Structures are given as structure tokens and as C-alpha cells.
Amino acid sequence: MSKSGTIRSGMGGWTFEPWDTSFYPDKLPKAKQLQYASRQVPSIEVNGTYYSSFKEPTFVKWASEAPDGFVYSLKGNRFVTNRRVLGEAGESMLRFLGSGVAALGDKLGPILWQFAPTKKFDPDDFEAFLKLLPEKQDGVALRHALEVRNDSFIVQEFAALARKYKAAIVYADHAKYPDIADVTGDFIYARLQTGSDDNPDCYTPKGLDEWAARARIWAEGKQPADLRRVDPATDAPVQPRDVFVYFITEGKVRAPFGAMALMKRLAD
């Protein structure tokens, strides 16, 4: 068995007007942007699936345009997570997962379930949601990541539930939202959201060095000592884990360069 999992870094999406003149080659047709982007970074988080519904031909097209080894993380549709009673999300979840996501095949990465900042932790209702998460869709294995954005989740019980259902808690490097570094699944999902367009590589060189070091620790199956855990008494099994690190939101113009700079550090 490999001593480390695979580390992939990327950004959110591939269509963003400022990238037309900063990231993409001059005069590159928009129809070629995905092909180009997927050859500069090994993964992309797709935000469009949160707002819109797509059909199988779209996922087939995305799979065909990206190279072998590339992985898409998909943000789960908002109708699944933006509801008062999470335990009633089953129909919406089945509709989203059954829309054709499995057509991505081995290019399907984690499904990111993002919860509203107003959604507070209700143990019973949240467990009812976790029980709905399927292990497979049309024969393709699914990996689930949970991004919570309310401080009420900073409790041991949340980490215990995520661990019970083998879902990964998203680590958010964010100015306002909770940062929870407990390892609860067999992969790691981090969203880096405090970058700046004033930095050529989104984060400072020191910040990128620190995130590269943490990514290596995670990939080896360990846990960075400098990140907060809500249940520090419970250690995850030491085993290789794939790591997904995305540069999101703040510093978006420079996000692709942050992802590439991080991958360069990891290759050195």
C-alpha cells in the first residue's frame, strides 16, 4: 500500500471572466477552457451543480474533456441542503445523484454538501440526513464531504456523527465560518478562502508552504497539530488518505495560480 494518498489542488469552476486575460492563453475559445484548465490543475470544484440541474450528457462531456487522473468535486444541489428539516431531503438527493453524476466514472471526486450559515446543529436531524447518503450511485462509489458554517457545529457530537457515517468534515480556512480539522472520513477536503488578489499566487509564499506541509501530513494519514479539532481525544486511524485542497472565494482571480503553486511545492 502507498505510504501517502494522492493530493489534488484546484479552484472553483473554470469559467470566470477575469481568468480570460489572466489564466487562459490569449484568444483561447471559451469552449476550450475546460480542456486547458484540467491540464493545469488536477481537480476542480464545480459550483454550478449547487445552483442548476445538469443531465447525463453534460457529465459525459466533462469526463471526455479532462485528462486521465483528473477529478471533479461536485457541490450538492442547494435543494438538498437548504431546508428546515434535513431528514426530508431524500427525494431531492436522489434526484441530484441520479441526474447523471456517475457518468463521470473515475473522474468523480467528493460530493460537497454545503449547509447555510443559518443552519444550526440538530443532532437528530443531522443524523437523519447522514443516513440518506448512499455509498454508491449507479455502481460508482461516492465520497461525501460536509461543509458546515455555523458555530453550533463546534461540538464533539458532530465529529462523532460524521465519523459514524464516514463523511469527511470540510476544513474551512475562512474569516467567519468554523474551522474543524477532525478527520472523520477516508479522505480530506479543505477549502482555502482567505486568499487575496494582491498575492500573485492567491496566498503568501509562507501560507502556501504551510498548506503544503499540512497536505502532506493529511496524505500520510496523520493530523496537523496546528489545526483545531472539536474532539482531540479521538484520533483517526493512521492510513493514507487522498487530499483535496481548493482555493475558493477570496482571491479568486489568482486562485488557479494558488492551486498550481501548491502543486509545485508538493512536487519539489
What is each stretch, according to the model?
Residues M1-D268:
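Residues lining hydrophobic/aromatic ligand-binding pockets adjacent to catalytic sites
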